[in-house]
UniProtKB/Swiss-Prot annotation:
GO biological process: translation
Full protein name: Large ribosomal subunit protein uL22
Domain of life per record: Bacteria
Similarity remark: Belongs to the universal ribosomal protein uL22 family.
Xref: InterPro entries: Ribosomal_uL22, Ribosomal_uL22_bac/chlpt-type, Ribosomal_uL22_bac/org-type, Ribosomal_uL22_CS, Ribosomal_uL22_sf
TM segment ranges: none
Keywords of the record: Ribonucleoprotein, Ribosomal protein, RNA-binding, rRNA-binding
Source organism of this protein record: Rickettsia massiliae (strain Mtu5)
NCBIfam families, A to Z: rplV_bact
């Protein structure tokens, strides 16, 4: 579910096909954007949003990629990008009165998180 892409001083992680609409996921992603990783992990731990647990797992994956693959200092990591994209839509049918039926769309989303090591000034 989590994939890795790394470069010089930043590491990324992505979670694909998360069973939540992109609108709801973007609320949490926008909240942690440009935040220190340590602060974001605390905020996500105590967030009342259901999807915060998945975002936290993806963020921990990005931090692990930065530490293990690139040797970055995890105390100086900042979330520079937290983007959300649309994924597939499951179409379901709900029976209604008088023999009719309506369509129900169940949305999926993709999450991309990039963490960067900031220099102390």
């Amino acid at each position: 579910m989590y994939m890795v892409q790394e470069n010089k001083n930043f590491a990324t992680a992505q979670a694909k096909s998360i069973r939540v609409s992109s609108r709801k996921l973007n609320l949490v992603a926008a909240f942690i954007r440009n935040m220190k990783v340590s602060e974001a992990l605390v905020q996500l731990t105590f967030s009342p949003k259901r999807i915060a647990k998945v975002v936290k797992d993806c963020l921990q994956s990005a931090v692990a990629n930065a530490e293990n693959n690139l040797g970055l200092d995890i105390d100086r990591l900042v979330i520079t990008k937290a983007t959300v994209g649309k994924a597939l839509v499951m179409k379901r049918v709900m029976p209604r009165a008088k023999g009719r039926a309506t369509r129900i769309n169940k949305f999926f989303s993709n999450l991309y998180i990039t963490v960067t090591e900031k220099e102390d000034n």
